Amino acid sequence: MREQIDPQVQAIVFTHAHADHIMGLDDADLRLQAARAGPTVPRGRRRRGSRWARVYSYAFDERTDELHSRPQLEFVRIGLEPFELLGVTVRPFRLMHGRTPVLGFRVGDIAYATDCNAIPAESWPLLADLDTLVLDALWDEPHPTHFNVAQALEVIERVQPRRAFLTHVSHRLDYAATNARLPPHVRLSHDGLRLP
């Protein structure tokens, strides 16, 4: 949030409903509402028993004041089928975050794969012919639910993207020192990073 949200952002796609990925939803909604011209985005059907509904119960309660307390966002459940979003095809693919299945996404020649420590066999074809791979790499030590830097570099070696950015990085990795030891086409991501 420190880098602000570009007022041109029209959609946010979530990989999974863990707290570190969804807890900024209210802030994102407020900033996007301020930039939005015209009516708010219509709401989709919301599943009352979902993790989203437990965390954001007020957003799923029809009695909550529509304009003041409920996010003015449409919630759409995503499966593994490709879908169109704002004229662009998004191709979801399965990743494993320990024993928890999560989603990665491919848009054009960019793939985003965070919070993962394994890539199932059926997902590898969606990582072929990439320009840019954004990949989880928590820190240097082994971890039960995240790739570490060495494992991420093995994935990058197999995928062969033109460039790669490591994301979901811990404070244990010094930005300058880590970038200095990475291959030239691999860098740590940073707040405010924009991919064309």
PLM feature spans:
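Binuclear metal-ion centers of metallo-dependent hydrolases, dominated by the metallo-beta-lactamase
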Residues: 120-196
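Short, surface-exposed beta-strand-loop junctions and turns on beta-sheet-rich folds
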Residues: 7, 119-120
